[in-house]
């Protein structure tokens, strides 16, 4: 997916075609219905937003290509083997094989991710692959509708079912696979005898028995809406972790220490789904309190959390201790999936956000965790943990096709959802990256094109194309990390002050060719790892964490004059000189296979 120069002629030529082929919604129409008060901000559809360049576009394109090239026969082989059908293709190894840790576990996630990418890009090859995988999967279910490859162990039933249902929901709604609804019903029917009576919690990384029901209610609610089958909703309510998670969080108690980090963070999405569908404000309070605890007590400067996949006990210096006790600091594709979903849900549930906390943390997580992972290879090697120890490296997980191979494609495929939100009277611009948004408003086809080299540069330009002038409010996120932000509309300064940590509203009658220019100065700052070790610091510039590239051993112990000693030597490349030696600092996301150090000692 390459960036496209947008001209008024091209827009006017394609507006009619877009109207017919892409479901572009108006602001008011998107917010009708009984849930409008619970969801004052709404996501745009995948079809309405495209990533058109920049580092996120590069990664998006690579992930698009990688998953599209996975062999259908390889992916379906374990299911065909279990069904006694001819099973061409190669064994995939690792977690995925019939004798692996969780056989065939991630097929539904691959289907889901490809459907989402296909919806945003319009790539028919993605939809074709989704159709083929769904059809192949359906052929293996047999008369008993068996989708669990090792039912005799009674382990990971919900873990796998959740992925099956996610795949069928997205295959139906995004790739228009007509059979996916009935397949979801068949999968549920076949699995009923295996389902636990209630959600089984897990603590830390203890051995089974337990099951992964944490995000399953979110998926079950969606499957219930898709199929009209009330059994999905009944099980969804049964699996909500009210006693263990949502009730204490709603009281602002802390249930996190010692718990498996990703499982409980992703479970918050189930609470969001319960709130949006049922309206119980307990779940909304729980998510708000959880976000505060995760971002102020649990996270590293990258936005990651959960060393050794376990939430720490706050205020005891455990994040600092983890820098030397482990190299497994954040379960990155899975954890970033949970963190980005949580931030988006809270954006959607918050009327007229008074500050930018959700968008700011979403930005931090995007740049320093999921964008910063190593690209997968063709052999089933995937990123899993991020390491924040001295002289770290980005390495693959020791087993092929792990859980993160599924959440990687889903998280990246969701990039378009992070950028813009709609309200009854306009839209929010929530993230800054090259992109295109298409929508209708009061009968006019509209397109907003975002052009920027951010964060390499400080400026963002939004160009509007429309078939007819229309009035609406455009709200721009002014991040809390910036100072001295400035906004121009058609070359003239906006009279409203661009205050850090707020959304600035531009209310006007928008015409074709209107242009908004935003400048977000990025300055270096340092952040302490926790309150007990304030001299151990990370280096931040804007939303981006900077690391020392190819550092000498022991650099983390030297007292550097950060950020005062930094001198720029290239785009996003800075040097500090210590005892006659140059130390180079670059964004964590730009590191590929080089060694790096993330935390330093304050001079």
Locations of regions flagged by a protein language model:
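N-terminal export signals
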Residues: 2, 10-30
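Low-complexity, Ser/Thr/Pro/Gly-enriched N-terminal "stalk/linker" regions
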Residues: 30-106, 124-148, 178, 185, ...
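Structural helix-adjacent loops and short alpha-helical linkers that scaffold large soluble proteins
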Residues: 39, 46, 53, 118-131, ...
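Glycine- and aromatic-rich loop/turn segments at beta-sheet edges
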Residues: 71, 75-99, 139-155, 190-210, ...
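Well-ordered alpha-helical segments within folded domains of soluble proteins
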Residues: 99-119, 156-173, 208-225, 259-276, ...
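Active-site neighborhood of glycoside hydrolase catalytic domains
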Residues: 223-246, 264-302, 335-338, 342-346
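C-terminal beta-rich recognition modules with glycine/proline-rich loops and embedded aromatic residues
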Residues: 236, 287, 359-463, 499, ...
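Solvent-exposed beta-strand/loop surfaces of large extracellular or lumenal domains
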Residues: 482-507, 526-532
């Amino acid at each position: 997916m390459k960036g496209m120069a947008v001209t008024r002629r091209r827009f006017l030529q394609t507006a009619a075609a877009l109207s017919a082929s892409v479901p572009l919604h108006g602001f008011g129409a998107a917010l009708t219905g009984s849930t409008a008060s619970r969801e004052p901000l709404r996501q745009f559809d995948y079809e309405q937003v495209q990533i058109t360049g920049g580092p996120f576009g590069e990664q998006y394109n690579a992930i698009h290509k990688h998953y599209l090239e996975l062999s259908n026969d390889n992916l379906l082989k374990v299911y065909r083997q279990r069904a006694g059908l001819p099973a061409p293709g190669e064994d995939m190894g690792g977690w995925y094989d019939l004798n692996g840790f969780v056989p065939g576990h991630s097929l539904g996630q691959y289907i889901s991710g490809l459907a989402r990418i296909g919806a945003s890009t319009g790539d028919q090859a993605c939809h074709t692959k989704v159709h083929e995988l769904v059809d192949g999967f359906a052929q293996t279910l047999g008369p008993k509708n068996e989708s669990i490859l090792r039912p005799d162990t009674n382990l990971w039933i919900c873990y796998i079912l959740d992925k099956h249902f996610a795949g069928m929901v997205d295959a139906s709604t995004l790739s228009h696979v007509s059979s996916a609804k009935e397949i979801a019903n068949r999968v549920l029917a076949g699995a009923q005898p295996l389902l636990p009576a209630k959600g089984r919690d897990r603590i830390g990384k203890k051995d089974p028995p337990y099951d992964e029901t944490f995000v399953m209610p979110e998926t079950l609610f969606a499957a219930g809406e898709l199929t009209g089958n009330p059994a999905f909703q009944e099980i969804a309510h049964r699996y909500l972790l009210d006693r263990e998670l949502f009730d204490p969080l709603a009281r602002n108690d802390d249930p996190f220490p010692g718990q498996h980090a990703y499982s409980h963070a992703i479970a918050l999405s189930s609470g969001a789904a319960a709130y949006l569908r049922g309206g119980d404000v307990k779940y909304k309070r729980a998510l708000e309190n959880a976000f505060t605890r995760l971002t102020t007590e649990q996270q590293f400067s990258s936005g990651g959390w959960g060393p050794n996949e376990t939430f720490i006990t706050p205020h005891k210096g455990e994040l600092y201790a983890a820098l030397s006790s482990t190299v497994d600091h954040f379960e990155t594709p899975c954890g970033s999936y949970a963190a980005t979903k949580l931030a988006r849900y809270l954006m959607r549930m918050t009327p007229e956000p008074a500050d930018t906390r959700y968008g700011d943390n979403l930005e931090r997580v995007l740049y320093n965790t999921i964008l910063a992972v190593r690209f997968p290879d063709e052999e089933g090697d995937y990123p899993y943990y991020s390491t924040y120890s001295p002289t770290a490296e980005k390495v693959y997980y020791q087993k092929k096709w792990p859980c993160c191979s599924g959440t990687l494609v889903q998280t990246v495929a969701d990039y378009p959802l992070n950028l813009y939100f709609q309200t009854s009277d306009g839209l929010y611009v929530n993230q800054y990256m090259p992109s295109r948004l298409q929508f209708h408003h009061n009968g006019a086809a509209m397109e907003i094109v975002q052009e920027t080299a951010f964060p390499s540069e400080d400026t963002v330009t939004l160009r509007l194309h429309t078939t007819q002038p229309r009035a609406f409010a455009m709200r721009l996120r002014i991040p809390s990390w910036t100072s001295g932000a400035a906004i121009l509309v058609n070359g003239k300064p906006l009279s409203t002050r661009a205050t850090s940590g707020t959304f600035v509203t531009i209310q006007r009658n928008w015409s074709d060719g209107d242009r908004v220019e935003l400048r977000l100065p990025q300055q270096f700052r340092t952040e302490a790892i926790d309150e007990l070790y304030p001299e151990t610091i990370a280096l931040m510039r804007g939303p981006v964490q900077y690391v020392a590239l190819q550092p000498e051993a022991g650099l983390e112990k030297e007292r550097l004059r950060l950020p005062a000693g930094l001198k720029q030597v290239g785009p996003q490349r800075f040097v500090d000189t210590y005892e006659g030696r140059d130390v180079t600092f670059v964004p964590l996301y730009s590191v590929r296979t080089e060694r790096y150090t993330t935390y330093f000692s304050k001079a």
